[in-house]
Swiss-Prot record:
Disruption phenotype: No effect on general protein secretion. Decreases the extent of glycosylation of serine-rich fimbrial adhesin Fap1, but the protein is still found on the cell surface. The partially glycosylated Fap1 is larger than the wild-type protein. Keywords: Cell membrane, Membrane, Protein transport, Translocation, Transmembrane, Transmembrane helix, Transport. The chain crosses the membrane at residues 21-41, 72-92, 112-132, 141-161, 166-186, 199-219, 256-276, 295-315, 353-373, 382-402. One of its GO terms (biological process) is protein targeting. This is Accessory Sec system protein translocase subunit SecY2. It is a multi-pass membrane protein. The keyword Transmembrane helix applies. It is found in: Cell membrane. The gene is secY2. Belongs to the SecY/SEC61-alpha family. SecY2 subfamily. It comes from Streptococcus parasanguinis. It holds the Pfam family SecY. InterPro entries: SecY/SEC61-alpha, SecY2, SecY_dom_sf.
Length: 418
């Protein structure tokens, strides 16, 4: 049996990568259970239990933990925040033709700075165990170092998964989302204390609603607008079917993922600023009302989702770069002159679908939370409202992983020439 598995493991690339992925997920789950020795295992990291649960639901993308302090409490939040800042630097041409070593060095320093900032914020309200005669400040510094180290260990695991496994960083995000999705459902039904008959009814309604949501997400993910293109000097039976695909939702699930990550950053910044300017009423007001359990925070989140949807749409489909590549390859759009006219036409198409994608993202992510707050419901209801956007993210990421596996198996579709 073991020999058969060993032979199959050597022959199957998918099985090899799947094994690596499972191993890395196991290490990640193990790291989530390793406590930081300077903080009690039963201590809530920030505020009260309900606040920490809400923050964890919002930080499900990055895997951040507020209910207890573990090696991977920061998750991949610093890395994702760095990636957002890096994309802004590239978009605004603030980074030239740098060498790979210089790029890696700057990305490392940015990640380190963000990890230290988040570690400082997450340890602000922590209750440390006064052990070995160390002072409170010393224990906090040790905790910050351990949390930052855990972040870079997790980044290393994600890099290994990208090289040898399946999904790269996406797998870590998927694990976090599924765990949070499951815990939210269990917590909601346990708090409501439904009767058995009511539980079955609500369960069926939830299942039907979730099925419709998944179906609609798949429809949006696979939907695309095809711009017919002509290829100069190409005369084959397939040249007439050449096209430029533009997805119906050009930004995909990235506005949700990076929007949640960015919304986790202001609380840390306000913690640092309140240490520098204690008693500042403006900072105190912002630190309290910028959260998603408050109306100003939800409104900021909706605007952030909109701008991220437009930004990522143009990042994924840059009209200038697309037009430039088409001209270099001898391709053109029928009825459109290469150059400025082609750029304007592609920009018009991308902008149309970017606006539609932004509208869809706001409906899935912003409106449910806004409705819950306007009805005056509690923080648990906000967590339930986040389930809609979480389901959207999970489906999108799973479809991306499935596409990667299909690409690996694409060689099986071709017959041997010899």
């Amino acid at each position: 049996m073991l020999r058969k598995l060993q032979k199959y493991w050597k022959k199957s690339i998918i099985f090899q990568r799947f094994t690596w992925m499972i191993g890395i997920v196991f290490i990640y789950m193990l790291g989530r259970q390793i406590p930081i020795p300077t903080v009690g295992v039963d201590k809530v990291v920030v505020g009260n239990a309900s606040d920490s649960q809400l923050l964890e639901n919002f930080g499900a993308i990055t895997g951040i933990q507020f209910s207890n302090m573990t090696l991977f409490s920061l998750g991949i939040g610093p890395t994702m925040t760095m990636m957002i800042l890096w994309r802004f630097l590239i978009t605004f041409k603030l980074i030239g033709s740098w060498t790979s070593n210089k790029v890696n060095r700057l990305q490392f320093l940015l990640t380190l700075a963000i990890a230290l900032l988040q570690s400082f914020g997450i340890t602000n309200d922590s209750k440390f165990l006064l052990i070995f005669g160390y002072s409170h400040s010393t224990l906090r510094i040790i905790t910050i170092i351990l949390l930052t180290t855990g972040t870079f260990i997790l980044n290393w695991l994600c890099k290994i998964n990208s090289e040898r496994g399946i999904g790269g960083m996406t797998v870590v995000i998927l694990v976090n989302m599924i765990l949070t999705f499951q815990s939210n459902i269990i917590r909601y039904f346990s708090v409501q204390q439904f009767k058995f008959s009511s539980l079955i009814q609500y369960g069926l309604v939830f299942f039907v609603a979730l099925s419709i949501l998944i179906w609609f997400n798949i429809l949006l993910y696979k939907g695309e607008y095809r711009i017919p293109i002509q290829r100069v000097g190409l005369n084959t039976p397939y040249h007439a079917s050449s096209y430029l695909p533009i997805r119906v939702t050009p930004a995909g699930a990235m506005p949700f993922m990076y929007g949640m990550t960015l919304m986790m950053l202001p609380p840390y910044i306000f913690v640092v600023l309140l240490h520098i300017f204690p008693g500042n009423q403006i900072l105190e007001y912002l630190s309290v009302h910028i959260g998603l359990s408050q109306l100003p925070g939800v409104i900021c989140y909706i605007f952030l989702l909109y701008f991220l949807s437009i930004g990522f749409a143009y990042y994924n489909y840059d009209p200038y770069e697309i037009s430039k590549n088409m001209r270099n390859n001898g391709d053109y759009i029928s009825g459109k002159k290469p150059g400025e006219e082609t750029i304007k036409y592609i920009q018009y198409v991308v902008n149309s679908f970017a606006q539609f994608g932004a509208f869809t993202v706001i409906i899935f992510g912003g409106l449910p939370m806004l409705a819950v707050l306007l009805q005056g419901q509690g923080k648990n209801s906000v967590s339930i409202a986040l389930l809609i956007s979480n389901a959207y993210i999970i489906v999108s990421l799973l479809l991306g992983v499935i596409e990667q596996v299909d690409t690996m198996n694409s060689w099986k579709k071709y017959k041997n020439l010899i």
